[in-house]
Swiss-Prot record:
Keyword Disulfide bond: no
Keywords linked to the UniProt accession: Cytoplasm, Cytoskeleton, Differentiation, Nucleus, Spermatogenesis
Function text: Ubiquitin-binding protein which acts as an adapter for ATPase cdc-48.1 and/or cdc-48.2, conferring substrate specificity. Together with ubxn-2 and ubxn-3, plays a role in hermaphrodite spermatogenesis probably by promoting the degradation of sex determination terminal factor tra-1. Probably in association with ATPase cdc-48.1 or/and cdc-48.2, regulates the centrosomal levels of kinase air-1 levels during mitotic progression by promoting air-1 removal from centrosomes in prophase.
Domain SEP: start-end pairs: 89-153
InterPro entries found in the cross-reference section: NSFL1C_SEP_dom_sf (IPR036241), SEP_domain (IPR012989), Ubiquitin-like_domsf (IPR029071), UBX_dom (IPR001012)
Domain of life: Eukaryota
Protein's gene: ubxn-2
Name of this protein: UBX domain-containing protein 2
SMART domains: SEP, UBX
Organism from which the protein derives: Caenorhabditis elegans
Record-linked Pfam families: SEP (PF08059), UBX (PF00789)
Length: 301
């Protein structure tokens, strides 16, 4: 008789110490097989191989994800998979670091941040977090877990190759500033909200971190992009023409980590038009030396 696939909803019934919470998962990990789980709405979670999956971890939510990343093989055959069909599938990886977590090549998310806990709670309920639903509308998501034993290392951006033509000074008020004054323009107008960490000093540091991670190649054509946030704050970044709109999204989330948890849409400022394909280069999207507006999208329960 075939055994059943463990789902995220089973966690609520088989929490720590439950009758079925350890045996089969431990057996699968001892065999060294990758543990994989497909949740509803096209979501999947895959745990690491072998004993690393059972390593100590202080965060209960991390343990729950690893416990959920379990498929019990039926006797004499492969386990059935609850993967929907008929839609394009996107594979994403949740990286667990010793000092936090990240999604794909995105910025570090602190495990102590309540919004990170909420993000993981969505995963633990078998739901795709709203920010991912917005970023990949109408697509199935294979969500995998990859555990690391070292601290987070920011990856270098890998812009698409290709050539471009330098354009004129379309936004003179932005391009006429020095690099230091441009940084000040992006931070001095910041308004302090309920989060005490949102000081001008911290925001300036976060913006500099975002610029470093962007790894702009100054030997290739460059463009200044001014990003207008929902609170009317402005960020200024120097991009290559071959950078994509996805790189702009990563830049925003690194410069303002709050945006990691807020589903948002990037739009051309004038005429107002949302960008449907974020894999486009800035040159192809016709936003060189331009303004990109950020619009927060409503979340759905």
């Amino acid at each position: 008789m075939s055994r059943n696939i463990r789902t995220f909803r089973d966690i609520g019934n088989n929490d720590d110490g439950g009758p079925d919470s350890d045996d089969s998962g431990a057996d699968a990990a001892e065999r060294g097989a990758p543990q994989e789980f497909y949740a509803g709405s096209g979501q999947a979670v895959q745990g690491p191989r072998g004993a690393a999956a059972r390593g100590p971890d202080s965060e209960a939510h991390i343990r729950r994800i690893l416990q959920a990343a379990e498929v019990v093989q039926p006797e004499g055959g492969e386990a059935p998979r609850g993967r929907p069909s008929g839609r394009e599938t996107i594979s994403l990886t949740l990286h667990l670091w010793s000092d936090g977590l990240s999604i794909e090549d995105g910025p570090l998310m602190s495990r102590q941040d309540p919004r990170t806990i909420e993000f993981l709670e969505s995963v633990g309920k078998g739901e795709i977090p709203p920010s991912l639903v917005q970023q990949y509308p109408g697509k199935e998501i294979d969500f995998k877990v990859n555990r690391h034993h070292e601290e987070y290392v920011a990856p270098k951006m890998k812009p698409f190759g290709g050539s471009g033509v330098r354009l004129g000074n379309v936004v003179p008020t932005v391009l006429g500033q020095s690099s230091s004054s441009a940084t000040t323009a992006g931070t001095s107008s910041a308004t302090t909200d309920h989060n005490p960490d949102h000081t001008a000093e911290n925001e300036a540091k976060q913006l500099e971190d975002a610029k470093k991670e962007l790894s702009t190649n100054m030997n290739e054509p460059t463009t200044n992009i001014q990003i207008r946030l929902p609170n009317n704050q402005r960020l200024v970044g120097i991009f290559n023409h071959s950078h994509t709109l996805e790189a702009v999204r990563t830049f925003i989330c690194t410069a303002r980590p709050d945006m990691i948890y807020a589903p948002f849409q990037m739009m051309a400022a004038y005429p107002p038009k949302p960008f449907e394909d974020e894999s486009q280069t800035l040159k192809d999207a016709n936003v060189l030396n331009s303004v990109v507006a950020v619009k927060i999208l409503p979340t759905t329960n």
